[in-house]
UniProtKB/Swiss-Prot annotation:
This is Non-selective voltage-gated ion channel VDAC2. The modification N6-succinyllysine is found at K31. It is found in: Mitochondrion outer membrane; Membrane. It comes from Homo sapiens. Non-selective voltage-gated ion channel that mediates the transport of anions and cations through the mitochondrion outer membrane and plasma membrane. The channel adopts an open conformation at zero mV and a closed conformation at both positive and negative potentials. There are two populations of channels; the main that functions in a lower open-state conductance with lower ion selectivity, that switch, in a voltage-dependent manner, from the open to a low-conducting 'closed' state and the other that has a normal ion selectivity in the typical high conductance, 'open' state. Monomer, homodimer and higher order oligomers; formation of higher order structures is necessary for scramblase activity. Interacts with ARMC12 in a TBC1D21-dependent manner. Interacts with KLC3. Interacts with SPATA33. Interacts with PPP3CC in a SPATA33-dependent manner. InterPro entries: Porin_dom_sf (IPR023614), Porin_Euk (IPR001925), Porin_Euk/Tom40 (IPR027246). It catalyses: chloride(in) = chloride(out); K(+)(in) = K(+)(out); a 1,2-diacyl-sn-glycero-3-phospho-L-serine(in) = a 1,2-diacyl-sn-glycero-3-phospho-L-serine(out); a 1,2-diacyl-sn-glycero-3-phosphocholine(in) = a 1,2-diacyl-sn-glycero-3-phosphocholine(out). The chain crosses the membrane at residues 37-46, 50-58, 65-75, 80-87, 91-100, 106-115, 122-131, 134-141, 148-156, 161-169, 174-186, 189-196, 200-209, 213-222, 229-238, 242-249, 253-262, 265-274, 284-293. The modification Phosphotyrosine is found at Y78. The modification Phosphothreonine is found at T118. The lineage of its organism: Eukaryota, Metazoa, Chordata, Craniata, Vertebrata. ATP binds at K23, K31. Belongs to the eukaryotic mitochondrial porin family. Ubiquitinated by PRKN during mitophagy, leading to its degradation and enhancement of mitophagy. Deubiquitinated by USP30.
Length: 294
């Protein structure tokens, strides 16, 4: 029993990747909203284990329609995942990932894209390593001018988190991104602060007030300007099948969203964005999204 307990406890000690720092707060602001879009997402899985994901959306302002198709197959015995992607810009993508095979906690991904219309090609090698108290990442983005190297590291100890993210452009021989982050998280509370390139400062707080209510606060400021961005968001679970979300920022933009699970595998989301400074002037946005999963 002791061994089983250690195995279950280990994942709780692994810090998130740098990109996922503050994710809980961002999700309250982003999920459950889809202003200005009519969107359809469909996910299915074949008997052979191949996963199909299709997504289509129409912009209500421009009328532009975009879509994506993705197929994924997992070869669990060897820790391999094969992914094929296509979008309406006629860009083809292939991704091969191998995880926990070379060593425990290491994931390698080979990602390529090709556009037949323009002949443009791109390639990227991604790597991540996560163990107790540490999460490392290193990506190499290949380009004809010279590869760009993206690196990140997050360290965690007793709820405290510290992270660093950088990008080195070999063509320019200089750092093009230099970010720092510090945070703290417990089961129902998360605090995140970050500094991007020494000019952008941000912070967020996530609080699970009770079992049905999640709240979030976001603050951002850019040096050299008098512009401070501030927002508050909340999500309330009405019942096991329905939830309502709301958010407002210092620009008086008010967003509301309602999500209803119509039946298992069928989810409907309605959302609206209202400009509080010009309620009678129009320009407000609505959105509709339908998710199907089988």
């Amino acid at each position: 029993m002791a061994t089983h307990g250690q195995t279950c406890a280990r994942p709780m000690c692994i810090p998130p990747s740098y990109a996922d720092l503050g994710k809980a707060a961002r999700d309250i602001f982003n999920k459950g909203f889809g202003f200005g879009l009519v969107k359809l997402d469909v996910k299915t899985k074949s008997c052979s284990g191949v996963e199909f994901s299709t997504s289509g959306s129409s912009n209500t302002d421009t009328g532009k329609v975009t879509g994506t198709l993705e197929t994924k197959y997992k070869w669990c015995e060897y820790g391999l995942t094969f992914t094929e992607k296509w979008n309406t810009d006629n860009t083809l993508g292939t991704e091969i990932a191998i995880e926990d095979q070379i060593c425990q906690g290491l994931k390698l991904t080979f990602d390529t894209t090709f556009s037949p219309n323009t002949g443009k090609k791109s390639g990227k090698i991604k790597s991540s390593y996560k163990r107790e108290c540490i999460n490392l990442g290193c990506d190499v983005d290949f380009d004809f001018a010279g590869p760009a190297i993206h690196g990140s590291a997050v360290f965690g100890y007793e709820g405290w988190l510290a992270g660093y993210q950088m990008t080195f452009d070999s063509a320019k021989s200089k750092l093009t991104r230099n970010n720092f982050a510090v945070g703290y998280r417990t089961g129902d509370f998360q605090l995140h602060t970050n500094v991007n390139d020494g000019t952008e400062f941000g912070g967020s707080i996530y609080q699970k007030v009770c079992e049905d209510l999640d709240t979030s606060v976001n603050l951002a400021w850019t040096s050299g300007t008098n512009c401070t961005r501030f927002g508050i968001a909340a999500k309330y679970q009405l019942d096991p099948t329905a939830s309502i979300s709301a958010k407002v920022n210092n620009s008086s933009l008010i967003g509301v969203g309602y999500t209803q699970t119509l039946r298992p595998g069928v989810k409907l989301t309605l959302s609206a964005l209202v400009d509080g400074k010009s309620i009678n002037a129009g320009g407000h946005k609505v959105g509709l999204a339908l998710e199907l999963e089988a």
